[in-house]
Amino acid sequence: MTIVPVSEIPTVSLLYHLRKLVPATFKNEVDAPKPSQSFNDRIALIRGDITKLQVGAIVNAANNSLLGGGGVDGAIHRAAGPGLLKECRKLNGCDTGSAKITDAYELPCKKVIHAVGPVYSSRFVNESAEDLAGCYTTSLKLAVANDCKSIAFSALSTGVYGYPSSEAASVAIKAVKNFLEGADGDKLEKIIFCTFVPKDVDAYNHWLPRFFPSTEEPETDDWEEVEAGESAENGPVAKEEGISTTEEAKVALPDVPTAEPTEGGPATKKLKPSDDDKKL
């Protein structure tokens, strides 16, 4: 599969321009966040295989052992080779809501950040959200501390850990925006949300415009909503023609590996998940 350079991963600004992301509408101006061209030029969204991204760091949806598991976790360990597991064995695990960093070995990125998201609990929604936000905030801090200029997140906790995709996307995007507004926010040149299954794709298509609104006036006549039952792989599509093949190529990536890992995962992760659960 083709390696994807960070420069070819579409930003929110580009997705708005290509009519791949629908601008949000707000009931009143008070509810609407202030648009930021700077933020929109640094936040990116793509659907595909996170192991093929040539970025500073990718964020693995890890478990507490950090020894590999199913879905994205297993795919990253397989693509990185045995060196990653060897280094992870020295880390003595990781607490839920936190993250640790390793080298990337055979992956095209420079570092792998292993974030341990929460198992979702409908009884402790606030605690789940706090732990999930902690994964994103800690990962961003680790990226900056290790001189990474770009970082790509998988959709943490939305697979077998049961976090509803829409709620998880909202927590993730809010945590990233809070970081951008902080003291170290200008130290990362690109922050990427890498999705794969349709429920995560739809969640980020919905929430990104609500935290990072378009800086241009929306032209509603140009939009055609994805029909029910269709995969919203690239979000809503434009009625107008003229988008170049090169621009289109930036919006899609090859499929993520789906085979189970050969070692390192706890017993619960050895169970074969459904298609929608092939990641944490």
Where are these regions (language model features)?
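Conserved N-terminal structural segment that caps and organizes enzyme catalytic cores in eukaryotes
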Residues: M1-I50
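Short amphipathic alpha-helices and their capping/turn segments at secondary-structure boundaries
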Residues: I46-I50, G97-Y105, S139-V144
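Short, conserved "active-site rim" segments that organize catalytic pockets and cofactor/ligand binding
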Residues: P33, Q37-T96
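Active-site alpha/beta core segments
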Residues: K86-V119
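Structural motif
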Residues: I43-A44, G56-I58, S98, K110-H114, ...
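Phosphate/ribose-phosphate-bearing ligand recognition and processing surfaces
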Residues: Y120-L280
